[in-house]
């Protein structure tokens, strides 16, 4: 639903803003929530209508955000700053919509693509720092806002169900891709099993570690704040590290048709790992360090099988621009995993070198 400007001014009046509102305009290119920039004769703000189709439990979502941001602020970290409603709540239900306001973080930039290893190293530092400052936080306090989000065995069961149904008869056109995921079935439970038996610690995980969720200082280029905290959940930090490697250490876009352009860059892997481990070295466990290289494989396989399951089901989840779009995405993910497997000894050596240097 598109709100009128008059409606938006009325919605903004429910929040304890400093200064008179002078303008409200659409902001950013996010696809989940609807976001506006609020200008006043004082500070600027971000006004958001939350997507309750994807996140139906607004109460616990905002509770998660409040718990994590208050913990970070107590340690002097810059983070999202929730602006309360005029009645002191963290969000408001207005005309059937769920709304919230954050203070706008000024003098920052963000990137959609990795421009160079230095920026990716800084991204690693930002998410390592995020993990480090929350290392003593009891992640079991958090609610799972999207069930089974990085539960790879559960995703594999979803994939097998889509394959068994094959409701559009597409399986015959992608048998090599199907065989790839079936042949790796013994790898999918490694992290979930570790979380269950305690060999991998339960931590706060961000679960959407795209580069554009880091605000960097416009002058120094240093990371200032991690944003988009809606998918904050309990899990393994290997989820965040692995997904960062999946998208950031690739030389091509996720839907590149020409697989000769798709490569796994160990240079970018090293850069991110240097930043991440450099911040987290005080709390990373030996088992987590051992699994850092594999986490890239795991999260890339998980994402690829989700693309393939969606292709088999008729493209009902991921937005597509042409009939084979999800299959193309699947193939890029498989190519990345194949190169990760080929370079496994190199990435293990990189992690060992960085861990040794960080001692």
Swiss-Prot record:
The Gene Ontology terms for molecular function here are: ATP binding; kinase activity; phosphotransferase activity, alcohol group as acceptor
Keywords, in A-Z order: ATP-binding, Carbohydrate metabolism, Kinase, Magnesium, Nucleotide-binding, Transferase
Q: How does activity depend on temperature?
A: Optimum temperature is 40 degrees Celsius.
The prosthetic group or cofactor this protein requires is: Mg(2+)
Q: What is its EC number?
A: 2.7.1.162
The UniProt pH dependence field says: Optimum pH is 8.5. Stable at pH 5.0 to 9.5 at 30 degrees Celsius.
InterPro entries for this protein: Aminoglycoside_PTrfase, Kinase-like_dom_sf, Pseudomonas-type_ThrB
Q: Which SUPFAM superfamilies match?
A: Protein kinase-like (PK-like)
Q: What class of enzyme is it?
A: transferase
Q: List the disulfide bonds.
A: none
Q: What does it catalyze? A: N-acetyl-D-hexosamine + ATP = N-acetyl-alpha-D-hexosamine 1-phosphate + ADP + H(+)
- List residues of the Protein kinase domain: 21-359
Q: Supply one GO BP term.
A: carbohydrate metabolic process
Q: Which family does it belong to?
A: Belongs to the protein kinase superfamily.
Task: Cite the PANTHER family for this sequence.
Answer: AMINOGLYCOSIDE PHOSPHOTRANSFERASE DOMAIN-CONTAINING PROTEIN-RELATED, SLR1880 PROTEIN
Role played? Phosphorylates both N-acetylglucosamine (GlcNAc) and N-acetylgalactosamine (GalNAc) at similar rates. Involved in the lacto-N-biose I/galacto-N-biose (LNB/GNB) degradation pathway, which is important for host intestinal colonization by bifidobacteria. Also accepts GTP and ITP as phosphate donors. In vitro, can phosphorylate several GlcNAc and GalNAc derivatives.
Name of the protein this chain belongs to: N-acetylhexosamine 1-kinase
Tell me the organism. Answer: Bifidobacterium longum subsp. longum (strain ATCC 15707 / DSM 20219 / JCM 1217 / NCTC 11818 / E194b)
